[in-house]
Amino acid sequence: MANVQYYDVILKPVVTEKSMNAMAEKKYTFLVHPDANKTMIKEAVERMFEGTKVAKVNTMNCEGKNKRRGMVTGKTAKTKKAIVQLTADSKDIEIFAGL
């Protein structure tokens, strides 16, 4: 990954019921760049959100699903998700505050 900035690593937050329940344990779920590694994700979260300290990062690669439109078959894009756990003394992430 040449020349990728920290704001290119985190694409968007994942807003599902499961990810909202995990926020009680200070675990936040993000869609990340497919080439990003755990150290890049940790650095990006700590830079983007002031006062946060990352305890650990879990990542998962999600394969694209097979889709069909008429006779034509294709695949949706592959994605990568990261579950970021913050330390106990860390501030909460503000983008999830109103949800």
Curated annotation (Swiss-Prot):
Cellular component, GO annotation: ribonucleoprotein complex; ribosome
Classification via Gene3D superfamilies: 3.30.70.330
One Pfam short name: Ribosomal_L23
Domain of life: Bacteria
GO biological process, one term: translation
Molecular functions per Gene Ontology: rRNA binding; structural constituent of ribosome
Annotated family: Belongs to the universal ribosomal protein uL23 family.
Subunit structure: Part of the 50S ribosomal subunit. Contacts protein L29, and trigger factor when it is bound to the ribosome.
Function according to Swiss-Prot or TrEMBL: One of the early assembly proteins it binds 23S rRNA. One of the proteins that surrounds the polypeptide exit tunnel on the outside of the ribosome. Forms the main docking site for trigger factor binding to the ribosome.
HAMAP family in the cross-refs: Ribosomal_uL23_B
Protein name in the entry: Large ribosomal subunit protein uL23
Organism: Agathobacter rectalis (strain ATCC 33656 / DSM 3377 / JCM 17463 / KCTC 5835 / VPI 0990)
